[in-house]
């Protein structure tokens, strides 16, 4: 896993819905157990009621692991976008504009591609675009990840896709992300297939 995330110092997890709490905690735990110093930072609106929930599981402003959405995006080498579909449709131009060149955009659903195709726009060419879609609800992704610490093979399977590889490392990042969130098996798909299902 350290090789898959080589050069990624910060992963920004944007949102705190069903998938975000599970994926953020699983990533943080996986990075720690692999001896990696990659930081997982949650990006939320400052007035979001979800800030209290993120703080309750150890993501805080004091530790630099909780911040404002666009500040987190601009500082992250990988941005995992786990906000609602409506928020993605509204905010994607600002989100993409805020990302660093060479960063990786991670999605857990293909919805954004459909929105962008409908709008007649494409992803920036200087970023990676990958998908990891766990095949279960967020709470089960976390519960089975924790169970997997003592029961070999426990976890939620996931699909993964590489939609755009700007750096030559997008495949490694996608597979590493799937492993880090606890998928015992990951199967290849496309971003388009994930939103047309």
Predicted regions span which residues?
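Rossmann-like NAD(P)-binding element
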Residues: 45-46, 55-114, 122-137, 146
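Predominant activation on well-ordered alpha-helical scaffold segments within soluble catalytic domains
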Residues: 24-25, 89, 93, 171-175
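Structural signal for hydrophobic packing residues in well-ordered secondary-structure cores
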Residues: 31, 87, 96-99, 174-185
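NAD(P)+-binding Rossmann beta1-loop-alpha1 motif at the extreme N-terminus of oxidoreductases
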Residues: 1-62
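Short beta->alpha junction loops/turns
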Residues: 16, 47, 84-85, 163
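Rossmann-fold dinucleotide-binding core
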Residues: 106-197
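Structural motif
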Residues: 10-12, 39-41, 77-81, 103-104, ...
């Amino acid at each position: 896993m350290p090789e898959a995330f080589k050069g990624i110092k910060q992963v920004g997890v944007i949102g705190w819905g069903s998938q975000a709490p599970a994926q953020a905690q699983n990533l943080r735990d996986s990075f720690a157990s692999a001896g990696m110093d990659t930081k997982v930072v949650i990006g939320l609106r400052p007035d979001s009621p979800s800030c209290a929930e993120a703080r309750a599981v150890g993501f805080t402003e004091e530790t630099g692991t909780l911040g404002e959405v666009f500040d987190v995006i601009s500082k992250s080498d990988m941005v995992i976008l786990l906000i609602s579909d409506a928020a993605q449709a509204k905010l994607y131009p600002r989100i993409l504009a805020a990302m660093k060149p060479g960063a990786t955009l991670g999605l857990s659903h293909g919805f954004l591609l459909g929105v962008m195709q409908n709008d007649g726009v494409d992803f920036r060419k200087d970023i990676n675009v990958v998908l990891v879609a766990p095949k279960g609800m967020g709470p089960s992704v976390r519960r089975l990840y924790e169970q997997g610490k003592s029961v070999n093979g426990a976890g939620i399977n996931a699909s993964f896709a590489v939609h755009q590889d700007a750096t030559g490392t997008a495949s490694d990042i996608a597979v590493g992300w799937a492993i880090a969130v606890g998928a015992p098996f990951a199967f290849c798909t496309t971003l388009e297939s994930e939103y047309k299902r």
